[in-house]
Amino acid sequence: ASAQEFLAQSIIGEDIFSHLVQNTPAFKKTLDEFESPSKQNNIFVLQAEEGLEKSAWARALYLSKYSDMGEFLKIDFNRKGFVENEENDAFLKELENENNSVVYIENLNKLSEGEKSNIRHRIMIYAKKSTAKIFIGISEKEEADFMDEDGLTEITIPPLRSSLKEVPQILDETVKFFVERDGHDYRRFSLAAQNMLTKYQWPGNLRQLVDLVQVLLSRRDKEIVNVD
């Protein structure tokens, strides 16, 4: 198969972030390190800075280890118009679906203390009778309320600045993804641009890098991306 054919096959069912997590050596190493605790426990707290796309890590884990066991379910409590009783009933119905192999939950901090307590209780009950893996995404600034419970494993996702040497490869992998998915012309970064970006601290993490690539790909005037 050609490189283009391989790329097309590799991005099926993936978003850009879960694709990068699975195909960048630095991220993949972290992903592989999750395997041992994942065999022992069912509930994980994913702790990361903003812009690291915690849901992508949960989805990457699903695609690499659990996709043949069931479905991936994402539950987001950041929806407007939250109605406690109705939403809780819907949450429980989704959570207890036997087809799930991975459940990712985020924005629990948007709930009241009473809502969080009730949902935490339901999650703990569900985890004892289900084989599905549950991932709860939090930011570093949030209080990890769930860490008070037994049987939880904390997973810290490293920021992009801890993998600065990998930035040129991450940039190229991001370009290839959007070239294949969206039909952009291939672009490459000059050595000067790569060197500059490996010194940048990326406060917006992976999302900032992806946004940068998308902006550059939308400009069709240059084949090579220089420092300017």
Question: What is each model feature region?
Answer:
Residues G151-L152:
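As written
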Residues D172, K222-D228:
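Short, flexible helix-to-coil linker/hinge segments that flank and couple to helix-turn-helix
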